[in-house]
Amino acid sequence: MAQNKMTQNKTTQKVIITHFNSRHDFLKLLENNPGLVIVKLGATWCGPCKRIKPVLDGFFASSPDNVICCDIDVDECTDLYSYFKSKKMVNGIPVILLYKKGNVNFFPDDSITGADPVELDKFFKRCGLHLKSLAPALSVREQR
């Protein structure tokens, strides 16, 4: 079962998932993806992870309801992180993975590794483009 915490925005609360008990729980989340799932893998002892935290928190807090945000500590979710490493999907932390609606496997649609502010900005802009590309498909489904 996924565990989460609430972050307080000025007018709304955003749920951020902070733990998966198993890889199976992660796949269940992807199966119920309403638009995008964004997963940051990091650790409390990781300097670059600490540097990107304010940027990541800001993005998570301002993300729309069809974006599921996950901030996962690799020392607490060893099963998931070990699996990502064994499949060569991650090679260090921090890493942020993006999953679009319909992607129900472990391989992300987009990702970024590291704490470069310019590259982070580019990644979050790509997240916005992915959301815009989903908007017509979501509104057509909602009309049915």
Located regions from the model:
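Short active-site neighborhood of thiol/selenol oxidoreductases, capturing the structured segment around
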Residues: 32-43
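Short acidic active-site motifs
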Residues: 25-26, 79-80, 119
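Short pre-active-site segment immediately N-terminal to redox-active cysteine/selenocysteine motifs
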Residues: 42-45, 92
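Non-catalytic, surface beta->alpha helical segment in thiol-disulfide oxidoreductase systems
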Residues: 91-92, 97-142
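The canonical Cys-X-X-Cys-His
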Residues: 46-49, 96
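Thiol-based oxidoreductase modules, predominantly thioredoxin-like and allied folds used
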Residues: 17-22, 41, 53-81
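N-terminal "domain-start" segment that seeds a small globular fold
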Residues: 1-28
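Mid-chain, well-packed structural core segment of small domains
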Residues: 79-92
